[in-house]
C-alpha cells in the first residue's frame, strides 16, 4: 500500500502547481494538465515518488543517518520545526546562513556561544551582571537561537537534507551538492528538478501540503530507527484509501482552483 493515497494528496492540495506563466519546463513530465491558468501536478506520479522518498529516508535512518529539514518560507516554518523534532532530527526554518554546511567549523563556534549564554542564564550569572549587559546577552541569544537553535545539537554535517521549496533554498542546496549530501525535496512546477536527488512533485506553498509531506518524511525516519509500530503518524482528515483517477481529480479542480494555492 502507498504511504500516502491520492485522496490524501488531493485533500491537502498537493496537486496545485503554479500559474502556467510561472513554470520550469523541466517539470513538464510531472504535470498532468492545465486548468484555469494553473498547472495540475500528476498525483499518480507523486504517489509513487513519495513511496520512493519514504523508502530512501527510512533506509538512511536505519543506518543512523543524520537529517536536516530546511524550509524558511512562512508556510513551512512550523511543520519543519515540529516534524523534525518529532523525528529526533534537526532543522533550519528561518534564514539560511551562508556556510551553514560548507563552513561548519565557524557555525559550531556560534553554536558554542549560544550554549555559553544559555548556561550563564541557567547558572545565575545573569543575576550578577549589570542589566545593560544582560539585555545585550539576551538579544544575542535570541538571534542565535532563531537561526541556529534547530541545529544546536546536530552532531555533524547531515547525511540527508529534506527541503521545502528548492528555489527559495537554493543556497542550502548548493552547499549540500558541494558536500555530496543527497537532497530530498518537495518540487513545485516552478522549480528545477535537476538539482534534487529524490524528487517529490508537489505544491510547496500550501500549508496542508507541506505538513502532509513533511510529516511523512518524519514517519520514515521514525520507522527506520524504531520500526513501524512506533510511528505515530500525523492525523489528517483524509481517509487512507485509494483515490480517484487523475481525470476525476481534474474535474474536482474546476471551479475550485483558488484553494490551497497560497502565494502562487
Curated annotation (Swiss-Prot):
Q: What's in the GO CC field?
A: cytosolic small ribosomal subunit
Read off the InterPro entries from this record: Ribosomal_uS2 (IPR001865), Ribosomal_uS2_bac/mit/plastid (IPR005706), Ribosomal_uS2_CS (IPR018130), Ribosomal_uS2_flav_dom_sf (IPR023591)
Q: Which GO terms describe its molecular function?
A: structural constituent of ribosome
Gene Ontology BP term (one): translation
Q: Which domain of life is it from?
A: Bacteria
Q: Where are the transmembrane segments?
A: none
Q: Record's SUPFAM superfamilies?
A: Ribosomal protein S2 (SSF52313)
Family label: Belongs to the universal ribosomal protein uS2 family.
Protein's recorded name: Small ribosomal subunit protein uS2
Q: Which gene encodes it?
A: rpsB
